[in-house]
Amino acid sequence: MTEIETLRRDPYAVYARRILRLKALDPLLRDPGAAERGTLFHAILHRFSASGIDPRDSGAVDALIETGQECFAEAALPADVEAVWWPRFRRLAGEIIEWESARIDGIVLRAPEARASKTVVGASEATLSGYADRIDVLPAGMADIIDYKTGSSPSKGQAHTLLSPQLVLEGALLRRGAFADVGPLQPADLAFVRLKANGEVLHESILEHDRKAKSAGDLSEEAWARLEKLLLHYRDPQAGYLSRALPFREAEVDGEYDHLARVLEWSAGGPGESDE
């Protein structure tokens, strides 16, 4: 599911990875970065949610910190990295429990790391699968889908306008019963929970943006229809895979496959230049 945004923004990258089967080599020497931090914090929250501990218990914060210690030990981070990341997590721990406690009464079931089975996308005959960071089942056949974020990307606006459709597509899969852990449900809210460096935990619904609101169901179906249209386009053997169709930043040309697409060479020339 994570590659759907790539297919929109940089189709050539999907072509190189999935059709040419080219995979970028890992750097020989590289310190853990933002992606690894996000993975680690996700693992802590997943393990804590799966434990079934009531966040209203007096020892909930200590239990979360203990879970964090376990996950940090397993990650075996370089000392200088842990010296920055661990205090950041400690600042978050109390706020996470406060956020959990504020919403626990309305939750029937917490399903962390819920897996969506392969689901056919309309007439395209292609399938979509993936994971949701967390699904909170509510009464009356409803559920909230939560996506933890340790950074600022994607923005609420990018998700609402479907430039970054992953969370919304999870809503479409939920409606289609793709998540076996919870069964077919209607999405009530689609939200990022941002774990900020200053210790703030921000629950950010993507259902409203620029004074325009849509229901989770309507937004999910719109994303599903757009995905079907996109996949049908690429079923045409004559359809090309454009490089950097909708790049995040025009000036950045350090994508894994940008050198294969000769991005620098194609962007070096300007209007009016000739081969003379």
Region roles according to the model:
Residues M1-E276:
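RecB-family 4Fe-4S metal-dependent nuclease core
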